[in-house]
A protein has these predicted regions:
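Substrate-binding groove of N-acetylhexosamine-processing glycoside hydrolases
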Residues: 39, 92-113, 120, 134-338
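Short, compositionally stereotyped local motifs that mark structural "simplifiers"
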Residues: 280, 284-404
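Short, solvent-exposed loop/turn elements at domain surfaces
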Residues: 255-257, 348-349, 412
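Residues within well-ordered beta-strands of beta-sheet-rich folds
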Residues: 50, 54, 367-369, 413
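Aromatic-lined ligand-binding clefts that engage carbohydrates, nucleic acids, or primary amines
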Residues: 329-331, 408, 413
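Domain-scale activation on soluble regions of proteins
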Residues: 41, 45-50, 57, 62-64, ...
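Substrate-binding cleft of carbohydrate-active enzyme catalytic domains
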Residues: 1-164
Length: 413
């Protein structure tokens, strides 16, 4: 709500109908009833869509643990170094709980695939938990990574016995093979996961964070990064490449309060992701796609989609000059109106229009923000102008004829 006021952007306003009061606190949220879920499933079915549920296990279960503390290793929710502590998979009671949750979901979601999660599991509690250590000894498991693999294998067998196929994030590969599972590769810092999964015969869905996480704000390079993503690297064999089933764009909505904001984060990135997905590898034409981008924007206008206005161009974040300089910022979207400020404030619809280059004679910070012809706002840019005198020339002493060269042979990131 504060961001909506700070940035003059109603996309960040929580809808009033979604707010409710608990005591003195105004909260947002809610839950789905069984009836709600059945309505969603039926609505999606008419449109050829399967709504695949993900109940993340054994990590990301803090809400369940808060409600049922016995699910945790030490009877309470806690945090590890980066993530909340997981379920205690050493207790049979915990395993029965997990199975009962999925039994109910199988009833509501009549699909072949279910998503078990399996990511971001902090295993530090398992190292100290008597129940988990007993489980490891009983199953002959060498370490806590193998304990997670044991849990995932058990849940996979549970799903398969009920005619379902398990999906998990690429962490499910840690601690042992999971043949038959579908792996969603999301960690680009673990590139070997794709090769490992496909060698095991697993199907793989590509959704690497740096490219396909649409909850990360788009910038001037986002579209090009997706365009240049190597879908099927040469390091994979032909058989492994056939295990790559497709791509997925992820939009996590913790900070997406409205559907309008969701559209803004999805488009136009979703367009290039779709085109990458259906184009034969090696034949995607970035220039051709970019040449069609404005046509796509017009189509989105006709559909009433709140897409992100293409990034402003022709500027540098810092511009140094000696006497004066003229701005040269350009908006690729025809009909857009640019508004600017020079006092450090956020541009609003009431700020001066940027209709022609500005003459800059002194230090200043320029903010420019695009507005669609219908009034929708885009992301603003910041350009810092610094007036400087010419640097004094060096006065070399004790020089010798020739050049001195240092050669560094290494790979720089």
């Amino acid at each position: 709500m504060g961001r909506a006021a700070r940035e003059q952007n109603d996309d960040f306003l929580l809808p009033v109908r979604r707010l409710w009061t608990d005591g003195a606190d105004t909260l947002y949220g809610g839950y789905y009833t069984r009836k709600d879920i059945r309505e969603v499933v039926a609505y999606a079915a008419v449109r050829g869509i399967d709504v695949i549920p993900e109940i993340d296990m054994p990590g990301h279960c803090l809400q369940a643990i808060d409600s049922y503390p016995w699910l945790a290793c030490f009877g309470r929710g806690s945090w590890g170094q980066s993530f909340s502590s997981p379920l205690c998979v050493g207790k049979d009671r915990t395993l029965a709980f997990c199975e009962s949750v999925w039994e109910e979901l199988f009833e509501l979601f009549p699909y072949e695939y279910v998503h078990m999660g399996g990511d971001e599991v902090d295993k530090s509690n398992w190292k100290r938990c008597p129940d988990c250590q007993t489980r490891m000894r009983a199953e002959g498991l060498p370490d806590e990574a193998a304990l997670q693999a044991w849990f995932m294998h058990r849940m996979q067998r549970f799903c398969e016995a009920r005619g379902r196929r398990m999906i998990g994030w690429d962490e499910i590969l840690e601690g042992g093979a999971v043949p038959g599972a579908t792996v969603m590769w999301w960690r680009p810092w673990e590139p070997q996961s794709v090769s490992v999964a496909t060698r095991q015969g697993c199907e793989v869905v590509l959704c690497p964070q740096s490219w396909f996480y649409f909850s990360l704000e788009e910038d001037a390079n986002s579209l090009a990064r997706i365009c240049r993503f190597d879908m099927l690297p040469d390091s994979l064999s032909d058989a492994q490449k056939r295990q790559i089933k497709g791509v997925q764009g992820n939009l996590w909505t913790e900070k997406i309060p409205t559907w309008s904001r969701a559209e803004y984060m999805f488009y136009p990135r979703l367009l290039v992701l779709a085109e990458k997905g259906w184009t034969e590898p090696g034949k995607f034409d970035e220039d051709a796609f970019m040449s069609r981008l404005l046509d796509y924007c017009r189509r989105l206008d006709d559909e009433g989609v709140n897409y992100r206005i293409p990034s402003l161009t022709n500027y540098h974040a810092v511009s140094v000059f000696t006497d004066s300089v003229r701005t040269a910022v350009v908006c690729p979207l025809p009909g857009a109106v640019l508004r600017y400020t020079l006092d450090g404030s956020v541009p609003t619809v009431n700020s001066p229009r940027y209709d022609a280059p500005l003459l800059i004679r002194d230090d200043c910070t320029l903010h420019i923000r695009p507005y669609h012809a219908d009034g929708r706002t885009g992301d603003w840019i910041t350009v810092r102008y610094e007036k400087q005198d010419y640097a004094r020339p060096l006065e070399p002493r004790d020089t010798e004829p020739g050049l001195c060269v240092d050669w560094y042979f290494r790979r720089f990131p």
